[in-house]
């Protein structure tokens, strides 16, 4: 498992008992996003703030800059997310504050893919229809965009997300996460800094859900891949879980020393195992689908 902090990338091979600092070949830029090649797990990608993309072929031991086509990166530019084409691990989409980029050769060359995104200032997140991978969704500072041709062209899909008088603005709605239901491909969830939304018609229209949540600033979201209708969201109020597709919510913070949760992830091998990254209080793990959490101190490792 890899963990990116404000300072370094860490890796554990023993479920968090010991950690190794992985930084050889990287700048001191903050790592914002990481991704593991689904075919060759020793190949790892890191997206940074200010220094574009790095790639490692040996499990993070050595890193190489992969910024060809990302040359307009500035010190404030952020790589937010990697998204793999399930049919080709060399084909990757990138969500950045400069827009959407695509590579077809594992990061050797990146191409900007922003046709139709006229008002967008930044792209925060990308989602893919698992049943129809040519369909992509982009969560941006201006709301949601959809592509039906693998980012060849984008169309704004903000009906119900924001008031009509704000539909054309570049900061209509800051979307932080967008996910497609693996059981119902036309059902899409969009988390934002102003609440949670759901579409049942492929983003043609949206409805607000989760209005009972005390804090409407949603930072991260996960759809349980093995349990239909189960959603996890995080923010300044901790972790919430819904077991009825967003109709009702349960706060699941037992064991957390802080409620400011910045990210959440479900294990690829154990569906009951979840990880939560906090803002300044380290990493937590749950072995019971979020009912209880335990701290995972990053100590006992080596550089």
How should each PLM-predicted stretch be described?
Residues 1-303:
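Extracellular glycan-interacting surfaces
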